[in-house]
């Protein structure tokens, strides 16, 4: 009897593995993704192909990195998800002559009606938060330089002027797309009239992360975010940035690689679960690469896999609870928690119980395998993108062996128990002639925006002299 049961369990797990095998990407697959990514990057940088390229390669107008000679108080704002952060950053000289960056910050959550109402409502809410923050720190009387981290696709015309191309990550505020974001912020501050600000720079969160990490490691020339969404930036040779005049030096380019796949480059790798996630998203057919990797979608992918296993009678005796059939019920943090389970399955059991399920030991093991399959594919898919960027940098610099540091931020990268190890190992396999160091950014996007502002202010002072 016991043998029969054991045999049945073994057969069940075997069938599960056959279904999950679709998530495995071979080295050849990753090399294919990498070379397609490089091709799209090239198309994004070139004037004649930029418009139709899926990877937009947006120039950021960030040309120089901080040298540690900027001092002063700066305010920075960070808008990139459902939370909005205001931060006071003091850049100064620390003990023993080294540079110090001190921060105080406060988080504000963005109400749904501000995210999906009008641009005026959204920016009025943002300026209300700034006003509240300045009151708390008794800084209303000071006109501070402000750096704005704005993590959406923007076509820059200068460091402090950028047009929003399109909202992502569930934002839909009308009247913002096609407009200068810094202008919308300045208008909202003017409408309030109870404080003054000098908006000197707007940067993407990847850029802010790179600049923030540059303070710790002078070889940091790539910034990457793996959180709600996924994106990267890097220092490109100016001669390759055809959208901006001039051939000298380097400029930071925001790849906006989340949109890779929008022209069919990923079609052969998309599974039925990806198509379902895409169809029920706020932006069907867009940001397909990001939807394979980002935390906004990872839990939902797992939920759809679990439903498939239930339908195949391989999980929960073929019966799903009402909660499990509800979109968004399996949160991305559950993926991290399931994979962090110590082996006694207690954590997995608790999560499944909250979803109205009564799992067996085998059920718990199968759910863990489903989570591992989805998150490992995300790490490997992401590694192909970064390897594409790094190999491109090495080739354009004609270096036999390139040493480079990548600054990384984002909840998936930081909080998932094995994402970063799987990701690092895969990137290194795909970049044999590079020595890569990864550093995690601390409060990266706020500090980074302030440091970009500090560089801009320093330059303005030098030009004025």
Swiss-Prot record:
Family: Belongs to the hexokinase family.
GO biological process terms on file: calcium ion import; carbohydrate phosphorylation; cellular response to glucose starvation; cellular response to insulin stimulus; cellular response to leptin stimulus; fructose 2,6-bisphosphate metabolic process; fructose 6-phosphate metabolic process; glucose 6-phosphate metabolic process
Species whose genome carries this gene: Rattus norvegicus (Rat)
GO MF term list: ADP binding; ATP binding; D-glucose binding; fructokinase activity; glucokinase activity; glucose sensor activity; hexokinase activity; magnesium ion binding
Listed PROSITE patterns: HEXOKINASE_1, HEXOKINASE_2
Catalytic activity from the UniProt record: a D-hexose + ATP = a D-hexose 6-phosphate + ADP + H(+); D-fructose + ATP = D-fructose 6-phosphate + ADP + H(+); D-glucose + ATP = D-glucose 6-phosphate + ADP + H(+); D-mannose + ATP = D-mannose 6-phosphate + ADP + H(+)
Binding site for ATP: 78-83, 228, 295-296, 332-336, 411-415
Domain named Hexokinase: residues: 10-454
Gene Ontology terms: cellular component: actin filament; basal cortex; cell cortex; cytoplasm; cytosol; mitochondrion; nucleoplasm; nucleus
Protein name, entry field: Hexokinase-4
Sorted UniProt keywords: Allosteric enzyme, ATP-binding, Cytoplasm, Glycolysis, Kinase, Mitochondrion, Nucleotide-binding, Nucleus, Transferase
């Amino acid at each position: 009897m016991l043998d029969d049961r054991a045999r049945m369990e073994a057969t069940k797990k075997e069938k599960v593995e056959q279904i999950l095998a679709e998530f495995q990407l071979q080295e050849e697959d990753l090399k294919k993704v990498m070379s397609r990514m490089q091709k799209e990057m090239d198309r994004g940088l070139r004037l004649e192909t930029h418009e139709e390229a899926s990877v937009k390669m947006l120039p950021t107008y960030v040309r120089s990195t901080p040298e540690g000679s900027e001092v002063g108080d700066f305010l920075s704002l960070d808008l990139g998800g459902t939370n909005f952060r205001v931060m006071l950053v003091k850049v100064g000289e620390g003990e023993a002559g080294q540079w110090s960056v001190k921060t105080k910050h406060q988080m504000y959550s963005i109400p749904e009606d501000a995210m999906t109402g009008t641009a005026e409502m959204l920016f009025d809410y943002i300026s209300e938060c700034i006003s509240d923050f300045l009151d708390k720190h008794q800084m209303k009387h000071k006109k501070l330089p402000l750096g704005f981290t704005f993590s959406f696709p923007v076509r820059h015309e200068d460091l402090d002027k950028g047009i929003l191309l399109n909202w992502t990550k569930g934002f839909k505020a009308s009247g913002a797309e096609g407009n200068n974001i810094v202008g919308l912020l300045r208008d909202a501050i003017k409408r309030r009239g109870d404080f003054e600000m000098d908006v000197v720079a707007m940067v993407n969160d990847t850029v802010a992360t790179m600049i923030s990490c540059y303070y710790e490691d002078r070889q940091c020339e790539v910034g990457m975010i793996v959180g709600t969404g996924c994106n990267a930036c890097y220092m490109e040779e100016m001669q390759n940035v055809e959208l901006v005049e001039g051939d000298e030096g380097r400029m930071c380019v925001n790849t906006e690689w989340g949109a890779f796949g929008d022209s069919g480059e990923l079609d052969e790798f998309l599974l039925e679960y990806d198509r379902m996630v895409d169809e029920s998203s706020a932006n069907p057919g867009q940001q397909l690469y990001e939807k394979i990797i980002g935390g906004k979608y990872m839990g939902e992918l797992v939920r759809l896999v679990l439903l498939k296993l239930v339908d195949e009678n391989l999980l929960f005796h073929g019966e799903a609870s009402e909660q499990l059939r509800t979109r968004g019920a399996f949160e991305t943090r559950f993926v991290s928690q399931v994979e962090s389970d110590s082996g006694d399955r207690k954590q997995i059991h608790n999560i499944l119980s909250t979803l109205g399920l009564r799992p067996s030991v085998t059920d718990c093991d199968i759910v863990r395998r489903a989570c591992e399959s989805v998150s490992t594919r995300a790490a490997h898919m992401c590694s192909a993108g970064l390897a594409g960027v790094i190999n491109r940098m090495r080739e354009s610099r004609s270096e036999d062996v390139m040493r480079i540091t990548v600054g990384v931020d984002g909840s998936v990268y930081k909080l998932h128990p094995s994402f970063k190890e799987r990701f690092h190992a895969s990137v290194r396999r795909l970049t044999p002639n590079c020595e890569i160091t990864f550093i995690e950014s601390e409060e990266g996007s706020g500090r980074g925006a302030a440091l970009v502002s500090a560089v801009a202010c320093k330059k303005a002072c030098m030009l004025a002299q």
